[in-house]
């Protein structure tokens, strides 16, 4: 079957294209779509969401290096409040008195908690954001997530000015807000928006462009945020700047960004759901279970599919998921552990942390944009090019990324080539480089040696992440 002719109309046409035209007057609107004016090209929905994504990434990333110092300060204050509250009753503790094993333990626990919360928020947030955006639209949910970011900054400003159990309660509020409105969920919603407003042939390029702007925003923000904190000698200044920038992004989103999932499609989806549940009364337990099922609905994609050519179940996605889980489990600990190590053992300033994280972003761009494509181009001829064809199961075409749009898409059969094992070899090489690089990074003692050694594990991590995405 020709994939081009089998593609659904909703996959081929932007959701913002408007109502269908009649046969008599369909030519002119079609020509306007194919040859848009220069003004419309400058202010397309993709352009608007790209601007929002870049500035959002800049605002949220510039506080990361200062977050490390704030967490260490809060951990020190909590440790003294619990173990020796009479020494510093006001909470103003000199930094030299925080160099204690107990403080380092509190700090490690707090960093681990933020990492775990971020991961859980990514798992639950994507499903919930998909469901809520299918009911209320992409734009309102995006505005809600931006509001959560602003509340998070206010809470971090507050936690620096309270002491004792109020500080602990405020830290708990920060954890809750970051679970709901974390960056992973926001980026996921942006990706859904791009899929809505772009045609099938242009989606890969649009998503790649969004990713590139995200990396650029992060690369600029790390150094900017760390420098603001270091040169102004204030942990609050960067949060005020980030709060203001996020507020501008929220206002821009409210008045400029068009909705990508219009009310007609939401109403149609609501009628489909009512038809499915008509005549079936649900208890509160069943309703709660249904909400949990929506949040975990992306996990259903891991179900093995049947390959009609081989006559066997296709477990490749399950293997990739297991690999991603194991590697991410290690990498998710390695980065916070490295930041804890640099903060507690070498007393890195936010500016130095900014240089380290900037090196991270630059190395990511180098690996994904230059090194990896050249590597594949040079070594691809060495591999056996005789590859078997794989036809996905019929159910694959019906699985939609958005839980609310499963009934809108139709089947698309795609014939793909199986792996020539080059991706497997790149993954193994990345494991080796990353393992050795972290060992070397822990043995060097100077800042510049650590700065030069930092890109090596990230290079391996980017290689591994790209192979997971390609698989």
Swiss-Prot record:
Keyword field contains Cell inner membrane: no
Composition bias type Polar residues, residue spans: 14-36
Pfam families: MFS_1
Annotated keywords: Glycoprotein, Membrane, Transmembrane, Transmembrane helix, Transport
Entry GO CC: membrane
Gene Ontology molecular function: any one: transmembrane transporter activity
Membrane topology: Multi-pass membrane protein
Region Disordered, residue ranges: 1-36
Function: Major facilitator-type transporter; part of the gene cluster that mediates the biosynthesis of psilocybin, a psychotropic tryptamine-derived natural product.
UniProt name for this protein: Major facilitator-type transporter psiT1
Native organism: Psilocybe cyanescens
């Amino acid at each position: 079957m020709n994939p081009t002719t089998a593609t659904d109309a909703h996959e081929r046409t932007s959701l913002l294209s408007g109502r269908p035209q009649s046969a008599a007057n369909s030519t002119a609107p079609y020509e306007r779509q194919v040859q848009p004016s220069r003004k419309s090209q400058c202010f397309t929905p993709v352009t608007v969401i790209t601007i929002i994504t870049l500035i959002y990434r800049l605002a949220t990333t510039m506080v990361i290096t200062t977050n490390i110092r704030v967490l260490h300060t809060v951990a020190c204050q909590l440790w003294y409040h619990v173990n020796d509250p009479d020494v510093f009753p006001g909470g103003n503790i000199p930094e030299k008195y925080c160099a204690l094993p107990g403080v380092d333990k509190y700090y490690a626990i707090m960093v681990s908690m933020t990492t775990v919360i971020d991961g859980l928020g990514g798992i639950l947030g994507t499903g919930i954001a998909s469901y809520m955006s299918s009911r209320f639209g992409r734009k309102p949910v995006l505005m809600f997530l931006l509001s959560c970011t602003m509340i998070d900054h206010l809470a971090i400003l507050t936690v620096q000015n309270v002491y004792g159990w109020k500080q602990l309660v405020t830290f708990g509020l920060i954890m809750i807000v970051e679970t709901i409105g974390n960056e992973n969920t926001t980026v996921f919603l942006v990706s859904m928006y791009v899929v809505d407003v772009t045609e099938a042939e242009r989606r890969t390029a649009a998503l790649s462009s969004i990713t590139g702007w995200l990396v650029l925003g992060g690369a600029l923000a790390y150094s900017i945020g760390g420098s603001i904190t270091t040169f102004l000698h204030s942990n609050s200044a960067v949060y005020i700047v980030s709060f203001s920038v996020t507020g501008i992004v929220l206002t821009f989103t409210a008045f400029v960004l068009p909705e990508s999932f219009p009310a007609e499609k939401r109403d149609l989806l609501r009628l489909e759901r009512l038809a499915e549940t008509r005549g079936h009364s649900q208890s509160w337990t069943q309703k709660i279970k249904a909400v949990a099922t929506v949040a975990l609905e992306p996990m259903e994609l891991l179900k093995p599919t049947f390959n009609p050519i081989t006559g066997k179940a296709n477990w490749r996605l399950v293997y990739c998921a297991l690999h991603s889980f194991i590697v991410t489990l290690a990498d998710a600990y390695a980065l916070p552990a490295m930041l804890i190590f640099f903060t507690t053992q070498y007393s890195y300033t936010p500016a130095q942390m900014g240089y380290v994280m900037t090196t991270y972003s630059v190395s990511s761009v180098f690996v994904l944009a230059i090194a990896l494509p050249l590597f594949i181009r040079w070594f691809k001829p060495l591999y056996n090019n005789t590859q078997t064809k794989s036809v996905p199961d019929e159910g694959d075409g019906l699985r939609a990324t958005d839980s609310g749009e499963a009934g809108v898409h139709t089947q698309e059969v795609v014939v793909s080539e199986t792996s020539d094992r080059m991706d497997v070899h790149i993954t193994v090489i990345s494991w080796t480089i990353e393992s050795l690089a972290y060992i070397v990074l822990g043995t060097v003692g100077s800042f510049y040696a650590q700065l030069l050694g930092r890109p090596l594990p990230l290079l391996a991590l980017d290689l591994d992440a790209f192979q997971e995405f390609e698989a």
